[in-house]
Amino acid sequence: MNKLSKYLSLIKFSFFQPKHGVELFQTYRQTNEDSKQTILPHEHSAMEIEKCLKSLFPELDTKKDNLLDQTKKLGSDLQTFLEKIKKFEFPSKQQPYPIDYSISESSRLFLYALCKIIKPKTIVETGVAYGLSTSYILQALYENKTGTLYSIDSEFKPWESELMIGSAIPDELKTHWKFVKGSSTEKLNGVLESAGKIDIFLHDSMHTYKNMIFEFESAWPHIKNNGFLLSDDILENNSFLEFYTRKNLKPILLSLLDQEHLFGILKKSEF
């Protein structure tokens, strides 16, 4: 799909789906506003996954190689899925999201390790796409034989569809999954209220300042003591930095291979 076709497709879609057209406009406007922000540096140093886990759980000695081995089959299954959709162009109904439209391997392994260690009962995430990171969370819940993941996502572009949201997730893992269709603006507060206290909140939806701050502020009161707030792409704007500074929290920053992205980790400790 060339740029002109993509543009015309968006106009037509917005005309017949005005609600999604509003979402598209809000995304564009917020992204444009964020582009004018001066991104402030984080004073805390980023760490590799093993150091992050050691910082959180000093009594454990979790190795990345062991995590890779434990998730080897899942990783292989997800790679097979990605290879199948690579033959289609982006954007299209068959490939509605870019192939690299997911959090990094280190982030996925961290999610898996965290869920294996703390054995959460309730997790809420925003943003699913193909469901790669979702699969790593669900793999841990499947092995734990307990826990529920609530995932919120929507399709608001003409080449997106509910069918492709979470399409990479292996069927056997879906017993621990509850998908909620809609934007986080519409659905997050309702999901949090019905879920009660949660162990983990993960932001991985629209990475704009306004949306991220909204999600952090909404989720934080619902997170249990010793629970976690996690966020991908914290260098997109200053929301994560401002949030933990205002709350007087010490973040843990997971470094990623490309060094242009960071995964943010906040542990809630009230006592």
Q: Where in this protein do the model-derived segments appear?
A:
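Membrane-proximal basic amphipathic "stem/tether" segments
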Residues: 1-61
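Generic hydrophobic, helix-prone segments enriched in Leu/Val/Ile
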Residues: 7, 24-25, 31, 75-92, ...
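Prokaryotic Sec-type signal peptides and long signal-anchor helices
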Residues: 17-20, 29, 61, 85, ...
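Class I SAM-dependent transferase core
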Residues: 61-105, 116-117
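Charge-dense, low-complexity intrinsically disordered segments
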Residues: 36-47, 54-72, 98-101, 178, ...
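Exposed alpha-helical structural elements
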Residues: 3-6, 20-23, 48-55, 63-73, ...
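S-adenosylmethionine/decaboxylated-SAM
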Residues: 3, 97-271
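Residues that form generic nucleotide/phosphate-binding pockets
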Residues: 56-59, 70, 84, 191, ...
